[in-house]
Amino acid sequence: MKKLLLACAALLGSVSLAVSAHAGGTIVVGASPTPHAEILAEAAKLLKPQGYTLKIVEYSDYVQPNVALDSKELDANYFQHKPYLDDFNAQKGTKLVSLGPVHYEPFGIYAGKAKSLKDLKKGSLVAVPNDATNEGRALLLMEATGLIKLKENAGLAATVRDIAENPLGLKIEEIEAAQLVRSLPDVDVAIINGNYAILGGLKVADALAVESADSLAASTYANILAIRAGDEKRPDLQALYSALVSSEAAAFMKQKYAGAVLPSVAK
């Protein structure tokens, strides 16, 4: 009987420790240095009064954060979009899930020789990324601004072959995404990934057009908070996600990144 009571006490103690770890304490999160770790540092300020300490582990690659999350070295990670996570799960056999979207980095149309979209004329040259995912995004932005019309249901897999209408006969040149900023002097406009635009010294505020928060691309490629399947109801992770999508975090993104990083959840 004594042994049974001791065993029960030990079991209750372990359950108590597990619950207390989730109800307060340290949350370990993996992240890319910019902007993810910076946004997490802001979220940490909101978590502290709730009894949570955020430990941020920075990674410079896109594989180890998921490996570490799967092996329980991390409680969550924040660096990727859901299509990447889904592909990682398929390739590695992991069971990681999204707790929700946090932010997106909008594509923009930037001026080259043409200083506004109205300056585009017959045969104007438009540079777009040459990789499949980003080219589709660029073409969807062109469609949203009325420059072209795509075939029905082309979606994010769209290529130049899916252009159904091109009233101005725009010439579309496919260029490596990292080289698009350099191409600006030689083209009329270029459609550039948010990260490359910033690295190239461009300001999103100066873009001729940018993706809207409710666009297919922005919702699909929003950066997410990833966790292990089964952890969705953990109070600490719910608190972390709430902090990341708070009005305070949204204001921080808008102020610090000047449009290059925007909250996925409108505040």
What are the functions of these language-model segments?
Residues 106-117, 221-234:
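A bilobed periplasmic-binding-protein/Venus flytrap-type ligand-binding module shared by bacterial periplasmic
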Residues 99-148:
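A conserved helix-loop-strand patch within extracytoplasmic ligand-binding domains
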Residues 87-99, 114, 186, 191, ...:
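Ligand-binding "clamshell"
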Residues 56-67, 154-182:
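Short helix-initiation/N-cap motifs at beta->coil->alpha
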Residues 20-28, 47-49, 117-123:
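Immediate post-signal peptide segment of exported/extracytoplasmic ligand-binding proteins
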Residues 24-34, 52-58, 125-126:
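Short, well-ordered beta-strand elements
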Residues 136-143, 244-264:
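Periplasmic-binding protein-like
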